[in-house]
């Protein structure tokens, strides 16, 4: 599976980039709003599955939208806000 970067280059999909970005957003929130490692892994896996189901290269923006949707689905509004910014 490929990702289309903002500069138009196609690169291999890397789930660890999602995990890292969501972890950073979660860590910046702190307290009870922080996500568990398991929740972060589940979000990354769900986004990966959604991207694979599209059967095409997806843009970075599409991946970010999917991550945001997953965060909102689990009511992680504070983490979503930090992820977006």
Mark where each language-model region is.
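Long, C-terminal-biased catalytic regions of enzyme "large/alpha" subunits
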Residues: 1-85
């Amino acid at each position: 599976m490929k990702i289309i970067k903002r500069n138009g280059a196609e690169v291999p999909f890397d789930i660890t980039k999602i995990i890292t970005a969501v972890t950073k957003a979660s860590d910046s929130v702190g307290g009870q709003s922080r996500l568990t490692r398991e929740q972060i892994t589940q979000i990354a896996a769900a986004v990966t599955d959604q991207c694979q189901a599209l059967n095409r290269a997806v843009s970075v923006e599409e991946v970010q939208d999917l991550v945001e949707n997953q965060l909102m689905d689990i009511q992680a509004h504070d983490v979503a806000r930090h992820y977006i910014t």
